[in-house]
Structures are given as structure tokens and as C-alpha cells.
Design a protein with these regions (language model features):
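N-terminal beta1-alpha1-beta2 module of alpha/beta enzyme domains
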Residues: 2-99, 202
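An alpha-helical appendage that flanks or caps ligand/catalytic pockets
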Residues: 5-11, 16-46, 158-193, 234-356, ...
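Conserved, mostly hydrophobic/aromatic
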Residues: 15, 65, 77, 96, ...
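Hydrophobic faces of well-ordered beta-strands that scaffold small-molecule active sites
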Residues: 15-19, 73-75, 105-107, 135-139, ...
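Active-site mouth loops of central-metabolism enzymes
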Residues: 40-56, 110-118, 200-210, 264-267, ...
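Acidic (Asp/Glu)-rich catalytic clusters
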Residues: 63-67, 93-102, 124, 128-135, ...
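Glycine-rich, proline-tolerant flexible connector loops at the mouths of alpha/beta enzymes
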Residues: 74-92, 111, 229-232, 362-373
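Alpha-helix-loop-beta-strand connector modules within alpha/beta enzyme cores
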Residues: 86-107, 378-390
């Protein structure tokens, strides 16, 4: 494989907006009778009329982020999840493409291990054409719970992911028709009509939360690695693994190969931001509650990834370890809230310490008021982002 190095300034940082699009009406009392928040919590708690309002609010936030100066918008998908009303990242990306004009659209990402790769390739190519070449295609394995939901053995997840990745790239770069004799996705005839606008294909990013294997895989392919909210010390360890692997592959990685996601909110005063920011703890107690065999079934993660997971404190999405307090999460720069001046100072620290080329702002959670989120987006665009780009 020939890797084409990316080129970026050593100090330039791009800032992306992200929302899980939560169904923020769920409470601890709603969840209390159920063993698991994903496997057992029923959709009788879902109100389509309320969801209609929420979806339109989230789309308005996308449009506002585009207007005030965010470089991109990140989206994702999850299944059987009240904290993420996005069962299809491609549907959400289509909406983003129509309500925005300038921003890149980073899809982190398509769960290609559990879906038809040819259909994924066609849909992403279609989105790239609709958006005018603004798509960044992120590929993910899917969570362990989603693997179980799909009726697929967790031990096959990574192998399926790697085959699906190779097939998608072939669909984008090889004229059809052709055959694909894969173990998991055999096709006698493939002849995709729609191909991406970007050549040879849209940029590919790979996200992760702590698995060394994921970092190594991303580096071997020359793909930027996006760390989704691990603590800074672990994130720097993962970045070192990326650098070591990149050197083995013959290229020198820069900031353009690394991004970092953190929960972040800006308000007019520190006091107001602190109050609103506590909503980031909405999923702390119940997001992945349930039997360990649902959230971490045997074979889904390597022993090394499991060792790392068990040794670190919980920051909102884990199932093992000591849970951190709101104050500790802020001290660790995992949650950043405050006035523009406070947030600028904290993000400058992260930028200097981690040197990411991309900062991904997880800016909405639970039942945060739409007006507060819109104000946060505005303050990011008018105050915070310009300051980060001046450095």
C-alpha cells in the first residue's frame, strides 16, 4: 500500500461541531425498572411528536454552526439508544448537506462490519455528490451491543470490518462490473453507478476510544485517528503508538493525522456555563448500564484493549472502573465549560499538550435547552474558534 502523506500547518486546527441528538426526556426513574438501558429499555418511552421537535432543533444547530464559522460537522449513528436518535449516519449526513453550505461533513461513522459494504459505498458516494465534495467518510466497527443486535459473533467483528473497508474502497476506485470473493461479503457481480466527487475517494477518518489495535490499523492505512474523549494521558499514549506505526510505514505524521473529541459548552458567564454543563453527566449513570456480557462480550476486544479499559476511570461511556466527578472531568479537560475566555484558555492547553489537527466539540447532551446550545455555538464561532486559529 502506498500512503500519500497529508499536508497541514503545524499550528492550524480545525474545529468540528458534534451532537449525539439525544432523546433528552429519559430520566433515571424511567430506566430504573430495566436491567439495561439499551437491550431492555422499550420504545414505549419514545414520543414521535417530541422527537419531531428535537430533530428540527438539532438541524437548526447544524445550520447555525455552519453559519458562524465551524470548519465541519461530525455525525455518527447508534442503535437501540435513547441518547442517540441517529440509526443512520447517512440519513443525518444528507440533512446536514442540505442545511449547510460550507462545512465539511465528517461521518464517524458507518458501521460497515454490520452492513452491506456495497450499499454503504454507493450511499457515501451519493452524499459526496449531493454535498459538492464535502464528505469525510469515517468507518467504525460498531459497539459490542450493536454487534449482538445484528446477530453477528463479536469474534468476527474486526475481520468483517477490514473486509468491508477493502470492498468499499474498491467500489470507489475500480470501474465495474467486478466480482468480490470475500469470506463475509461475497458478490458475484458489483457494478456501482454513483462514484464520489472527490478523487480517488473521500478522505477517510478512523475513530476510537482506546484500543491500540484501532490506532495501529489507522496508522497503517495513513488515516487520521480521531480519539473520542479518552483522558489526555491515555490519548497521548495512543498518539505515540500512531507515530511509531507511521514511522514503520515510512511517513511522518503531523497534526492532520490526529483529532480529539471533548464535551464542551460556552455561555456568557462561567457560572451559567457550570450550571448548564452538568447536563453532560446525563448519561454517566445509565448509558451503558447492564450485564457485562452485553457491553463487553468475549472476543469483541483484545486483552490489551480490555486491560486499558479496566485500568482507567469512567468518563461517561465505560462499564468498569471508578467514575469521575464533574469537577474531576473538568480538571482533566474531558469536559470544558465556561465563558469564552475560560474555554479559550482550556482549549489552548489541550491544543498545546496534544497538538491535534482537529478539535471535535461534543456540544449538546440530554435536555439542554435549545437556546443555550445555540448561544454556545454562536460564542464558539465569534469568540473561541477565531482565538484558536490565531495561535
Amino acid at each position: 500500500m502506498t500512503l500519500v502523506p497529508l499536508r497541514r500547518s503545524q499550528t492550524l486546527v480545525d474545529v468540528y461541531w458534534f451532537s449525539e441528538q439525544p432523546y433528552g426526556y429519559v430520566t433515571e426513574d424511567d430506566l430504573a425498572p430495566y436491567e439495561s438501558g439499551r437491550m431492555h429499555f422499550p420504545n414505549t418511552n419514545f414520543d414521535p411528536e417530541k422527537a419531531h421537535v428535537l430533530y428540527n432543533n438539532y438541524h437548526e444547530q447544524y445550520a447555525w454552526a455552519d453559519e458562524v464559522g465551524f470548519d465541519g460537522i461530525m455525525s455518527n449513528e447508534h442503535h437501540s439508544s435513547y441518547w442517540c436518535m441517529k440509526p443512520s449516519v447517512n440519513v443525518d449526513a444528507a440533512v446536514i448537506a442540505k442545511v449547510t453550505k460550507k462545512t465539511k461533513i465528517a461521518m464517524l461513522g458507518n458501521v460497515i462490519a454490520l452492513n452491506d459494504p456495497v450499499k454503504m459505498a454507493e450511499e457515501i458516494a451519493m452524499l459526496d455528490c449531493i454535498s459538492g465534495g464535502r464528505i469525510i467518510s469515517g468507518f467504525v466497527r460498531g459497539t459490542a451491543v450493536e454487534t449482538l443486535h445484528a446477530g453477528i459473533s463479536p469474534t468476527e467483528n474486526r475481520e468483517r470490518f477490514e473486509e468491508a473497508h477493502d470492498l468499499i474502497l474498491k467500489c470507489w476506485t475500480t470501474p465495474g462490473p467486478f466480482r468480490w470473493e470475500g469470506r463475509h461479503f461475497p458478490h458475484r457481480m458489483i457494478n456501482p453507478w454513483v462514484v464520489p466527487m472527490q478523487k480517488p475517494h473521500p478522505p477517510v477518518w478512523f475513530p476510537g476510544t482506546g484500543s491500540p489495535e484501532s490506532v495501529i490499523w489507522a496508522a497503517k492505512h495513513g488515516y487520521p485517528y480521531m480519539n473520542l474523549g479518552s483522558l489526555l494521558d491515555l490519548t497521548k499514549q495512543l498518539k505515540s503508538i500512531y507515530h511509531e506505526t507511521a514511522h514503520e510505514m515510512g511517513f511522518e505524521p503531523g497534526p492532520e493525522h490526529f483529532g480529539y473529541l471533548m464535551r464542551c459548552l460556552v455561555a456568557d458567564t462561567d457560572e451559567k456555563a457550570q450550571k448548564i454543563g452538568r447536563t453532560f453527566l446525563w448519561t454517566e449513570n445509565h448509558r451503558n448500564r447492564g450485564p457485562i456480557e452485553f457491553n463487553d462480550p468475549p472476543g469483541y476486544q483484545s486483552r490489551e484493549a480490555m486491560r486499558i479499559k479496566m485500568s482507567r476511570p469512567l468518563i461517561g461511556t465505560g462499564t468498569m472502573g471508578r467514575r469521575m466527578t464533574y469537577e474531576e472531568l473538568q480538571e482533566a479537560h474531558n469536559i470544558v465549560v465556561g465563558s469564552p475566555e475560560t474555554v479559550i484558555k482550556k482549549l489552548r492547553y489541550v491544543k498545546k499538550d496534544l497538538k491535534p489537527g482537529y478539535i471535535l466539540i461534543y456540544g449538546n447532551e440530554g435536555n439542554m435547552r435549545h437556546e443555550d446550545v445555540m448561544r454556545s455555538i454562536e460564542l464558539f464561532g465569534t469568540k473561541v474558534i477565531p482565538a484558536l486559529k490565531e495561535d
